[in-house]
Amino acid sequence: MSALRTKLDSLIAQTDLDVSEKQREQLVGYVELLDKWNKAYNLTSVRDPLEMLVKHILDSIVVGTHLQGERFIDVGTGPGLPGIPLAIMHPEKTFFLLDSLGKRIRFIKQVVHTLGLKNVTPIQSRVEEFQPEEKFDGVLSRAFASMTDMVEWCHHLPKEQDGVFLALKGQHPKDEMDLLPEWCSVTEIISLAVPELEGDRHLVILSRKEN
């Protein structure tokens, strides 16, 4: 068994997550591809594949239990984070991964092909220019500097009725919450437990205020 697989198994054992053999293989396969492409294309500042398991894989998949609905878009996905790990964990849900940089989307297409992911659609576009045929149950991001930027640039993406924004943040984002636009409110803040990750992680769920 590879060092990556051994480490992944150890990390998963520290959570309540139910991860199949196939999913474990796909998660390791994703990290191997990310490590390989990263050397040429600089897709992430994390260089050590073992560190990627903590900072990219576990940090993404712990969000999965909080995804309500079936159709999600990951905006500013970079090399596919958190979208690819979540798509591996939730084959019954559909994930659209959006980024404006061609090299990132090319990488994601390679991942989709190599791992045989049927529920991922890569999209090269600026988020404010992307007009989906159908709106989303959830708009995910861990890339945006501020939640205000996220909700204003992505305001056209969630479903009118029950669509939400899901922002992955570090420390409790109280300062950011005070700056949110009038039409948007925080419905829940969830403290995330990521094994062996230093620092706090929070998932902030935001929605449109009822008219």
From Swiss-Prot:
Catalytic activity: guanosine(527) in 16S rRNA + S-adenosyl-L-methionine = N(7)-methylguanosine(527) in 16S rRNA + S-adenosyl-L-homocysteine
Gene3D superfamilies listed in its UniProt record: Vaccinia Virus protein VP39
Domain of life where this protein originates: Bacteria
Molecular function GO terms recorded: rRNA (guanine-N7-)-methyltransferase activity
Biological role: Specifically methylates the N7 position of guanine in position 527 of 16S rRNA.
NCBIfam families xrefs: rsmG_gidB (TIGR00138)
UniProt-recorded name of the protein: Ribosomal RNA small subunit methyltransferase G
Source taxonomy: Bacteria, Pseudomonadati, Pseudomonadota, Gammaproteobacteria, Vibrionales
